[in-house]
Swiss-Prot record:
CDD domains in the record: ADK
Swiss-Prot/TrEMBL domain comment: Consists of three domains, a large central CORE domain and two small peripheral domains, NMPbind and LID, which undergo movements during catalysis. The LID domain closes over the site of phosphoryl transfer upon ATP binding. Assembling and dissambling the active center during each catalytic cycle provides an effective means to prevent ATP hydrolysis.
Region (LID): 129-135
PANTHER family for this protein: NUCLEOTIDE KINASE
Protein known as: Adenylate kinase
GO biological process, one term: AMP salvage
Gene name tied to this protein: adk
InterPro entries assigned: Adenylat/UMP-CMP_kin, Adenylat_kinase_CS, P-loop_NTPase
Keyword annotations of the record: ATP-binding, Cytoplasm, Kinase, Nucleotide biosynthesis, Nucleotide-binding, Transferase
Binding site for ATP: 12-17, 130, 172
A cellular component annotation (GO) from this entry: cytoplasm
Catalytic activity: AMP + ATP = 2 ADP
Subunit architecture: Monomer.
Compartment(s): Cytoplasm
Amino acid sequence: MKNLFLIIGAPGSGKTTDAGCIAQMNQSVAHYSTGDLLRAEVAKDSELGKKIDKIISGGNLVPLEIVINTITSAIHACEKDFIIIDGYPRSVEQMTELDKVLANEYDINLSAVIEVNVSEEVAKERVLGRARGADDNEEVFYNRMKVFVEPIEEIRKFYNEKGIFHSINGERTIEEIVTDINAIIVKKIVQG
């Protein structure tokens, strides 16, 4: 049985960095960033990669079927039983589709959804300060922030009703944030 942990948060919340730290701390945990999985496809310079690149460059969401197929392929190919995926879901449609897919995946259990919560001001400061790529400018930031904010209440409610939603303060030191996220994951590992 694979145990899946989703880490969500605004652009610049630190979710990818946090998840990477946890995977380094725990040998039994694998980490995939939705963005990295999609950027890897772009790097292949395939037709699909070119399509994804155009969408990402505008700060928009990649079509649902592409993201779901990318995620489920990564989970099935993973040799580890505890998997963190950050940056997913980003819309109600993505959440609903993942729920449908997981209902038919008897070897994958969604163990927790963890939101790294930061204010828009902190998110903007972090994103514009990191200059990771062409998608890190003010106009694209506001578009990405809008894409994040619009569905977040419904996403929180959905996973809260399932009893698997956790929100942590992402405006602290990375050590404090990682400790909190790791505690949630380790608890699930120990429970089996």
